Structures are given as C-alpha cells and as structure tokens.
A protein has these predicted regions:
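Short hydrophobic/aromatic-enriched beta-strand-loop microsegments
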Residues: 23-26, 85-87, 112
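ATP-dependent NMP and nucleoside kinases share a basic, alpha-helical "lid"
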Residues: 32, 56, 69-109, 118-127
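Short, low-complexity, polar/charged sequence segments that are solvent-exposed and flexible
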Residues: 41-45, 82-83, 109-112
C-alpha cells in the first residue's frame, strides 16, 4: 500500500521498485471510468476493491496505489488484506513541498494546491501496528 500526497511520485516509485507487481490504482480507475477526483468516488473504490479481491484470491502480490493519508482511509483496505491473510507493507513517500507541487502541476489530473495543503494537514503517518512493515522513503 502506498501512502503519499499527490505529486510525490507514487507511480514512479512503483515502476522503479516493483515493475512486475500488478497495481490497483485509484487514479487509473478514475481515468477508465471518466470520474474526476472531485466527483463521487463510490464506483472507483468499488472497482478497486473488486480488483484487490481478485489478486488476494489468487494469492498474488499487488500494490494498492492511492494517497491513504489517514488511519481511517487505510483501515478498510488493510482489513481486507488481513481477511485474506496477506502480508501488508505500507510505503510512505515524502518529497520537499515545492517539488511535490511542481510534479503535481505536470500531472494529467492536477490537484489544486489548497486541496493538497489540506491533505497534508490531515496526514497521519502509518503506525507499525497497521501493517507487517512500514517503509519510509524520503
């Protein structure tokens, strides 16, 4: 599971470090469904959970690629992983503020700076109690 603000390089980190591991990406599902991050996320999350269950049933490793910035936002997904007996690792990515904003401006789906700032205000780093392993990449 990834844990990071928009623009920190989650996709890039996954491509560089886990190139052969399937990914369940909320951004990719939004694009498939034609849903903006500003719209209701119910169908996006439902599709993501369907895909996660497919991987879990097949005992196949995968990456959950979303911001996952608070314990509440991680809880449901991590419970699903535990229900299937999966080994869970949370990768926390952090970059300097200005670098993250620059990267965000170069994304296809730009998130407004005030929204990212609010997300940062709610960010709660994961506890080692939430997963088998927590990796922090700065």
């Amino acid at each position: 599971m990834m844990c990071a603000l928009p623009g920190t390089g989650k996709d890039t980190w996954i491509r560089s470090n886990l190139p052969d591991v399937p990914m369940v990406s909320l951004d990719a599902i939004r694009a498939e469904l034609g849903v903006s991050w500003e719209d209701g996320q119910g169908p996006v999350v439902a599709r993501a959970f369907e895909r996660a269950r497919e991987h879990l049933r097949a005992h196949r490793s995968f990456v959950w690629n979303a911001t996952c910035l608070t314990p509440d936002l991680r809880k449901r997904e991590l419970q699903l992983f535990r229900d299937y007996g999966a080994y869970t690792e949370i990768v926390v990515l952090e970059v300097p503020w200005e670098e993250g904003l620059r990267r965000n401006r170069n994304r296809k789906a730009v998130v407004p700076e005030d929204v990212i700032d609010a997300m940062l205000g709610r960010f709660t780093p994961p506890s080692v109690r939430e997963a088998h392993e927590v990796l922090s990449v700065v």
